Amino acid sequence: SFVIARMPINKAKYLTDYTYNYEYNLVFGGESYPMGENVYSIPNSWIVDAVNLSVESEFKWIVTAPSLDKGWTYCGKVDSDATRYGKSVRRKTLSTTSNGKKILKDTNNSTLDFTPEVKPSLMN
């Protein structure tokens, strides 16, 4: 998932106060492997917008709160398929104002709001 957030604090405070460590055991083939990492969190209240992404054939679950995004979209249909590169998702346009400003669709559901597998706009 990707988010756009407004950070109401400075960088130093964020890096100090919003870090956490997670740990779990990856169990595979009868073996258990301890896993973990130090990461940073972004409170949902700071998030302006979110999009959940997956390769279509590999989608498992939505990792954001439903208030942020109730759906998901994709840039490739099959993992490890070289044709999935050079693609993007693009938010759908509802309308365009008289001065040319696009009004974008935003229902907090990426399945409905984005067109998958489009050519990135900077490549046009």
Predicted regions located by residue number:
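Intrinsically disordered, low-complexity linkers and terminal tails enriched in Ser/Thr/Pro/Gly
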Residues: S1-N124
